[in-house]
A protein has these predicted regions:
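Short hydrophobic/aromatic-rich motifs at helix boundaries and adjacent loops
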Residues: 1, 57-61, 108-117, 156-162, ...
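Membrane-embedded beta-strand positions of outer-membrane beta-barrel proteins
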Residues: 1, 29, 40-42, 100-102, ...
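Transmembrane beta-barrel wall of Gram-negative outer-membrane proteins
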Residues: 1-3, 12-52, 77-93, 97, ...
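Transmembrane beta-strands of outer-membrane beta-barrel pores
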Residues: 3-5, 33-35, 44-48, 93-95, ...
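Short acidic, glycine/proline-rich loop/turn micro-motifs
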Residues: 7-13, 112-114, 168-174, 213-216
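Flexible loop and strand-edge segments within Gram-negative outer membrane beta-barrel domains
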Residues: 16-22, 36-91, 104-139, 166-167, ...
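Hydrophobic, lipid-facing positions within transmembrane beta-strands of outer-membrane proteins
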Residues: 23-27, 81-87, 138-144, 182-188, ...
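Structural signature of Gram-negative outer-membrane beta-barrels, strongest in the C-terminal barrel
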Residues: 151-163, 171-279
Length: 279
């Protein structure tokens, strides 16, 4: 294996420190009485996996020597934990069904590696000095839907959903910036079936989203560039890992469709619409 122009040996035909282990737990419960239905689901997934030392961090042949244990996990390694909690609530009347979903997710990923840097001015962190990268993404989601069957041939569906995300970071290195993201949308869909051969449907939806990305700079890179003789304009350009962004988006989508089934062997579909997708 060649890493950063250095040939890294593989002893005993085994990639050292590539073992891993994981644990998962799931829980689900449901309750139903007459027109009311409810459920709750909880899951948690954890994984820890080692990285081959010969392809991560500063090349060091001494770290590749066999330690006699093919299952241990040493630096460098990654840890990932995903927690998910969701609940579904529904109540049905004679001609109307109302349902809602609420959810929460936490995605936490960390990468650990012996502290290393490209710049001599970057000090060893006082807390968790070997934590290279960490991402903590929290997601909250909500949706509500209504279905109304006013007549046997006419059906209406309404919906509203929202989601909020927040990502925070830590560690002595950088990969992704901190950000907040909010999205929401409302929709209406109607379907008319005068008989078993014809179906006409139409709908409209409006979506809105806001993205806020936090700025992140590298002062140690800026110092290095200044020492190398770069002018202030170049230093200011390269020092930022991410720039501050605060943008909002919103637009509508609509569609109209017809399905005609004159016989068991023939079916004609016609659809026309306009779509918008949040970035």
């Amino acid at each position: 294996i060649v890493y950063l122009t250095v040939k890294m040996p593989v002893y005993g035909r085994r990639l050292k420190n590539t073992a891993g282990w994981e644990r998962n737990v799931n829980f689900f419960t449901q309750y139903q009485k007459k027109g009311y239905k409810s459920n709750l689901a909880v899951s948690n997934v954890f994984q820890k996996a080692g990285f081959f030392p010969g392809a991560h961090g500063v090349p060091d042949l001494s770290r590749l020597e066999d330690d006699g244990d093919s299952r241990n996990i040493d630096l460098p390694y990654s840890k990932v934990n995903h927690l998910k909690v969701t609940t579904h609530q529904q109540y049905a009347w004679e001609k109307f069904i109302l349902s809602g979903d609420i959810g929460y997710q936490n995605n936490h990923r960390e990468e650990w590696s012996a502290f290393h840097t490209h710049y001599g001015t970057q000090p060893l962190p006082e807390t968790d000095p070997d934590k290279e990268l960490a991402f903590n993404l929290n997601t909250f989601s909500f949706s509500a839907k209504g279905r109304w069957i006013g007549f046997s041939s006419w059906e209406h569906r309404m919906g509203w959903d929202s989601q909020f995300q927040r990502n925070t970071i830590s560690g002595y290195s950088f990969l992704l910036p901190e950000y907040d993201r909010f999205t929401t949308g409302i929709s209406w869909l109607t379907t008319y079936r005068p008989d078993n051969t014809l179906s006409v449907s139409g709908g409209v939806r409006y979506d809105y989203g806001r993205m806020r990305v936090f700025a992140h700079d590298d002062p140690y890179l800026a110092t290095y560039l200044q020492e190398q003789g770069y002018d202030e304009e170049q230093v200011e350009f390269y020092r930022w890992n991410s720039r501050r962004v605060n943008r909002s988006f919103g637009d509508y989508s609509l569609s109209l469709g017809v399905v005609w089934t004159p016989s068991m062997r023939h079916q004609l579909k016609v659809n026309v619409g306009r779509s918008f997708r949040l970035p």
